């Protein structure tokens, strides 16, 4: 199942020529989701060719305008494009969004908008994966989101099937590998007889704007990718604390403690718009497998077969 991330906006509070306001587009199988929706997100979607038609779920981390103001134009464009399917919007402050949508007359669109509040530990389930909200530490009420794939079936043990159970290669192998029981020579063969231990599904964690927290470390444990706020260098740590953000070094420390496979730094302050290498260098001293998010950067989350 394809699990693909596209960064639509990677700037901090203020957009720049190089970086748009925060937004991440995620495709997981047949689901298309948006995480945050800053100013100009719909145009970024047009450039990236993500499409609007199959976008049914938008997850907002907090209600600072650089993370949600792009919702309004996107919602109206969907209506003008004759959308009829319900749109789900998730946020840590549902009542505020409901009031704004009502004020903008969005109760009269040709489709319904369902706003749901998500608190720490609450989840939204999809086919094969779930999105879990987790508490973050910002200057307003905020959450991050973990995209967690269901555990996968274990690897098929061909040698055991053929030599120990006497099942010849062929269609029966495929059924067992899919988790289906079969009958061979009057005996029922269940998948657990030929499959190894379940394999952990893929996991991507996005903090939104946040200080480094134990909760982030906990939910990001062994994640394939951690996308973490890295607004400033360590020399501006006092300002990071005051404004509810993280330094690149702090993001790397979270990644190291959580034992993630890859760290992606985002929410890059305009101080570093033209050259974010100082942030990258700072983070790599703590956690080597770190990259800086760039607008329109896409990557596929692959299976770890180790």
UniProtKB/Swiss-Prot annotation:
This is Ribonuclease Z. PANTHER family: ZINC PHOSPHODIESTERASE ELAC PROTEIN 1 (PTHR46018:SF2). Its EC number is 3.1.26.11. SUPFAM superfamilies: Metallo-hydrolase/oxidoreductase (SSF56281). Binds 2 Zn(2+) ions. It catalyses: Endonucleolytic cleavage of RNA, removing extra 3' nucleotides from tRNA precursor, generating 3' termini of tRNAs. A 3'-hydroxy group is left at the tRNA terminus and a 5'-phosphoryl group is left at the trailer molecule. Pfam families: Lactamase_B_2 (PF12706). Zn(2+) 1 binds at residues 62, 64, 138, 209. Keywords: Endonuclease, Hydrolase, Metal-binding, Nuclease, tRNA processing, Zinc. Belongs to the RNase Z family. Homodimer. Zn(2+) 2 binds at residues 66-67, 209, 267. GO terms for molecular function: 3'-tRNA processing endoribonuclease activity; zinc ion binding. It is an enzyme of class 3 (hydrolase). Its cofactor is Zn(2+). Zinc phosphodiesterase, which displays some tRNA 3'-processing endonuclease activity. Probably involved in tRNA maturation, by removing a 3'-trailer from precursor tRNA.
């Amino acid at each position: 199942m394809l699990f693909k991330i596209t960064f639509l906006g990677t700037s901090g509070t203020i957009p720049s020529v190089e970086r748009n306001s925060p937004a991440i587009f995620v495709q997981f199988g047949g689901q298309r989701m948006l995480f945050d929706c800053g100013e100009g997100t719909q145009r970024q979607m047009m450039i990236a060719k993500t499409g609007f038609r199959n976008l049914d779920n938008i997850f907002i981390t907090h209600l600072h305008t650089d993370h949600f103001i792009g919702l309004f134009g996107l919602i109206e464009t969907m209506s003008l494009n004759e959308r009829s399917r319900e749109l789900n919007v998730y946020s840590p402050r549902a009542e505020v969004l409901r009031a704004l949508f009502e004020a903008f007359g969005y109760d009269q669109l040709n489709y319904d908008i369902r706003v749901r509040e998500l608190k720490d530990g609450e989840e939204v389930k999809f086919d094969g994966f779930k999105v879990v909200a987790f508490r973050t530490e910002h200057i307003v009420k905020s959450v991050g989101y973990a995209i967690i794939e269901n555990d996968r079936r274990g690897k098929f043990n061909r040698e055991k099937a053929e030599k120990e159970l006497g099942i010849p290669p062929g269609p029966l192998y495929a059924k067992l590998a899919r988790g289906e029981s079969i009958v061979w020579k009057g005996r029922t063969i269940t998948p657990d007889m030929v499959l190894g231990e379940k394999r952990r599904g893929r996991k991507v964690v996005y903090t939104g704007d946040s200080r480094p927290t134990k909760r982030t470390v906990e939910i990001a444990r062994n994640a394939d990718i951690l996308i973490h706020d890295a607004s400033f260098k360590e020399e501006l740590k006092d300002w990071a604390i005051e404004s509810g953000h993280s330094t690149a070094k702090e993001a790397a420390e979270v990644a190291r403690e959580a034992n993630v496979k890859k760290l992606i730094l985002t929410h890059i302050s305009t101080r570093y718009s033209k050259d974010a290498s100082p942030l990258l260098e700072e983070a790599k001293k703590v956690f080597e497998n770190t990259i800086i998010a760039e607008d329109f950067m896409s990557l596929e989350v692959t299976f770890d077969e180790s």
